[in-house]
Amino acid sequence: MCHKIEQLRSILDNSKYTVALCGSGMMEEGGFIGIKKQDKAYDIESRYGYCVEEMYSSAFYNTRPEQFFEFYKKEMLLRAPKDTATGSALAAMEQAGRLQCVIDSNIYDKAHRGGCRRVINLHGSIYENQCPRCKKKYSLTYILDAKRVPLCDECNVPVRPMISLIGEMVDSQNMTQTTEEITKSDTLLLLGTTMASEVFRQYIKYFSGRSLVIIHKAPHYSDKEATMVILDHPMNVLPLLGYEKKKQAESNASS
């Protein structure tokens, strides 16, 4: 592991433009079990009477808002992944000039909340909610505190979480920005995801840089195409690069 950490640090230190792609493994390291996982999906359907694909959809939000928000709050918000060391490690990398952009396929905004400034939340964020009619914005707390359906206090219609639900198109601006960032990257980090990812594979094909590094818990057949593979959770790897210690040392020196 020490040799790989040194090698990864060298790649990052010599990279002109580094982009990190954060996949579902980032949620798993925080204790979240994906709702599409077979056992989880079966459990949800047995408890709610509907499959995940039905409940986590715009059609369900529009036609059965009470059931949609019961599911959304219990399964997506109250079971949200815990913060891990990955968020602060990415922020330290960014501050050290070793990371130029984070592209997150998850909805929990962990990189941004960990301190990163340049983040593209490909599928939106649970922290962004608005009325579909008047566009008034509402906090996550407002959604959680609502007894049943969180309604706009101006229009009396259900507030819409600004996330991509199953079957919906990803925001076109996010898609364009993601493609542009990957195209100009010199180094691409795949964190908690693989080159065969349903979400990222359509973007990875635009990468023509020097180094593609995968940090993921489980091996995958597509790993052979990477420059380097580290089989572990990102939270166990990124802090070892030492950028957080460097950040702390610089902070102490300036105080």
Residue spans for each PLM region:
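Conserved catalytic core of sirtuin-type NAD+-dependent deacylases
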Residues: 1-255
